[in-house]
């Protein structure tokens, strides 16, 4: 079991032997209560590459004080952290399984080992209001940090710092107003906000940390500069979305599908921008796999929202409650299975390889000569690849099918339409990265229109397939199927309309 809370604090640098400022009268603080000093002993862990530090995450095993145990801290800013506590274990040499599981993505699936031992002599002062209720806690820390790597200096680093942490439940804005008021009092005694707010970061100073080694940004005006900037945003979005999906929150499902597809589009459409190698090839395949599995889940989520109801009120009144409930149950089951498939993918080695590739592309870009050209020149090459590929799939999607049975024709129609849809969606996202300033505006617009109408057609075809399956189950159970027919007719109309629009749009690509 673990518990999580929000930690809002500010750290100040104070000279050793210097006096603490008088804080009475600041932000509702009317009296203070000093406590006896106590000792803290913490060992911090990370991967060989220091992936956790790079992700602004710390994990430690700490003894002493009121909250001994294993702690995970995720920094939102220099003052705001999300802290997760796990019970203290007797085995100080092994990270508990539940801690490793909580850090799976940040550690990129790699093992952890001790990197720093930090011992602290802490003296706490409770900061109280007029009623004696605690406003914040001041911790005056004398810190000793010893790196544990092979190149560590023999002498520990020593410094003094003061942490002021607000009590649980205080609004972040109120907390920062308090800190702003405290800054003046600390300045009066020659202290100020710490240049480095993390004990771990200070303790690791000089450590050989591969993930902390970065390269210069590509020059402005180059395609490489645009790609690095875009991939940085996509990586941030992906990590946020995958964390929510792991926790069972599906609210970002469609956004996750869009993010995954754009990453796949960049790694595929701009492949010459990245150095050749098996690792990047595997990462590109992983991006394709993630895009595919999240697209299925997003489509399943769409069916949950839209399939139980017709597009017009008049038609909707013809659908009985039992039909609606069965459809809703079936679509939710399909959605839940699709989400499980996504979570399984997020726990796999290909996803970790994709994250490693994104880390390198963003933190240590090594652009090729092709990528160092202007966006307009690169767009010419990309357009020459994208346009014929889309056209080929378009012809297959709008061609007459000669399959013997209706079921075979429908399956073939769905497959070719999906292929054209995926190609046009990728093409649009590929072009969106550089924009219509680089690509011909007419082509950019036509690809976008084709992607929109194909999205509607794919949704309609999948809706028909789901309705057919659910109606067959209902019929075998002796239930009426009139409502399914109403909804199916509605979807057939949408499919036919979107088909005509798709043919018109795609023939212009």
PLM region spans:
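Function-determining surface determinants
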Residues: 1-509
């Amino acid at each position: 079991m673990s518990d999580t809370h929000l930690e809002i604090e500010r750290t100040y640098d104070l000279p050793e032997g210097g006096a603490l400022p008088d804080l009475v009268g600041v932000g509702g603080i009317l009296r203070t209560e000093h406590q006896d000093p106590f000792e803290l002993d913490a060992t911090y862990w990370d991967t060989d590459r220091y992936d956790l530090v790079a992700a602004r995450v710390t994990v430690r095993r700490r003894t002493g004080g009121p909250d001994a145990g294993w702690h995970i801290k995720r920094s939102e800013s220099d003052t705001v952290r999300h802290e997760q506590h796990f019970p203290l274990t007797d085995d100080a040499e092994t990270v508990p399984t539940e801690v490793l599981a909580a850090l799976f993505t940040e550690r990129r699936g790699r093992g952890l080992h001790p990197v720093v031992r930090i011992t602290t002599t802490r003296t706490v002062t409770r900061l109280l209001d007029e009623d004696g209720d605690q406003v914040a806690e001041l911790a005056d820390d004398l810190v000793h940090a010893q790196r544990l790597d092979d190149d560590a200096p023999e002498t520990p680093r020593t410094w003094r710092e003061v942490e002021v942490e607000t009590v649980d439940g205080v609004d972040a804005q109120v907390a920062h107003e308090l800190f702003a008021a405290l800054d003046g009092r600390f300045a009066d005694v020659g202290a100020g906000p710490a240049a480095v707010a993390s004990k771990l970061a200070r303790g690791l100073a000089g450590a050989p940390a591969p993930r902390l080694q970065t390269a210069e940004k590509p020059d402005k005006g180059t395609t490489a500069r645009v790609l690095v900037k875009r991939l940085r945003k996509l990586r941030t979005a992906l990590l946020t979305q995958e964390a929510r999906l792991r926790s069972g929150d599906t609210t970002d499902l469609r956004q996750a599908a869009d993010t995954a597809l754009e990453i796949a589009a960049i790694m595929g459409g701009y492949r010459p921008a990245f150095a050749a190698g098996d690792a990047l090839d595997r990462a590109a395949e992983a991006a394709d796999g993630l895009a595919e599995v999240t697209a299925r889940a997003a489509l399943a989520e769409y069916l949950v929202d839209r399939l139980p109801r017709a597009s017009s009120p008049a038609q909707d009144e013809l659908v009985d409650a039992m039909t609606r409930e069965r459809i809703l149950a079936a679509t939710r089951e399909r959605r839940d299975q699709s989400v499980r498939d996504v979570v399984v993918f997020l726990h796999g080695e290909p996803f970790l390889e994709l994250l490693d590739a994104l880390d390198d592309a963003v933190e240590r870009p090594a652009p090729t000569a092709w990528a160092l050209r202007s966006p307009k020149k690169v767009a010419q090459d990309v357009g020459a690849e994208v346009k014929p590929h889309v056209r080929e799939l378009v012809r297959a999607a709008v061609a007459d099918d000669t399959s013997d049975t209706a079921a075979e024709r429908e399956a073939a129609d769905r497959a070719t339409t999906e292929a054209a849809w995926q190609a046009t969606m990728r093409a649009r996202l590929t072009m969106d990265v550089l924009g219509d300033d680089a690509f011909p505006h007419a082509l950019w617009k036509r690809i976008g229109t084709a992607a929109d109408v194909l999205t509607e057609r794919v949704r309609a075809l999948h809706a028909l397939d789901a309705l057919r399956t659910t109606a067959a189950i209902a019929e075998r159970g002796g239930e009426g199927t009139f409502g399914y027919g109403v909804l199916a007719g509605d979807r057939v109309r949408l499919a036919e309309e979107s088909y005509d629009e798709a043919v018109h749009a795609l023939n212009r690509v």
